[in-house]
Amino acid sequence: MLRKRVEIGPVESGLWNAVETDGAAHLTLIDPASQDPERAVQMARSAADAGTTALMVGGSVGATGSALDRTVRAIKDSVDLPVILFPSSAAGLCDNADAVFFMSLLNSRSTSYLIENQALGAPIVSRYGIEAIPMGYIVVEPGGTVGWVGDAKLVPRRKPDIAAAYALAGRYLGMRLIYLEAGSGAESPVPTSMVSAVRDAIGDTLLVVGGGIRDAEAARKLVSAGADLIVTGTGVEESGDVFRFVKDIVTAIHV
């Protein structure tokens, strides 16, 4: 008897559709620990108006509990875009999001970030009925807070083959998205040579790139190198005009 194939949920399908339609897509990352829900809603509205495809909510430190729940709830009540959780641990889950990037930090030295938090979180995700999107997460130098918190063996910036090997392992493990992360607030993004190497290794798996993306030109170069989804968080928070910042990136990456 043939077993039923795994079905892709509506949020993940929406990401695929956006990439297929426009060549690439933008995701806005909002950290509940960085601002109150009211400010988060303002950022989300501006990003939505500018053409971001979905809103990620999470962070390396403090994105848990009531701050997370209130932020997700406020955004859901105000913005008609999918809200995807971006948890650093099982504590970064709540029941009012649309989906979760269910990820393993592939180059972590700690089993906590490779599989233990995932085992703790899986029953919660199932009980909440949140769409789980399987993702391999790879942290590249300098790594920022997430590299330290996640005890990552950082991929050297001049070693694209190492990133490609981790990414290919993620693909073979069944992860449908691979995320290259330079770290929140990094001075520069993941090198384009590394993005290209990973793109070649993982075929049609969705490739996400985040960290250190501070302007539209940087985003455009990453997409030209092979990125499908561009994530900005710190850049959005620090921009004086969220709409303009996101709009410039969205315009630059659409082909």
Curated annotation (Swiss-Prot):
One of its GO terms (biological process) is glycerophospholipid biosynthetic process. Mg(2+) binds at D31, S60. It is found in: Cytoplasm. It comes from the Archaea. Keywords: Cytoplasm, Lipid biosynthesis, Lipid metabolism, Magnesium, Metal-binding, Phospholipid biosynthesis, Phospholipid metabolism, Transferase. It catalyses: sn-glycerol 1-phosphate + (2E,6E,10E)-geranylgeranyl diphosphate = sn-3-O-(geranylgeranyl)glycerol 1-phosphate + diphosphate. Its cofactor is Mg(2+). It holds the Pfam family PcrB. GO terms for molecular function: magnesium ion binding; phosphoglycerol geranylgeranyltransferase activity. The keyword Transferase applies. Pathway: Membrane lipid metabolism; glycerophospholipid metabolism. CDD domains: PcrB_like (cd02812). Belongs to the GGGP/HepGP synthase family. Group II subfamily. NCBIfam families: GGGP, GGGP-family, PRK04169.1-2. This is Geranylgeranylglyceryl phosphate synthase. It comes from Methanothrix thermoacetophila (strain DSM 6194 / JCM 14653 / NBRC 101360 / PT).
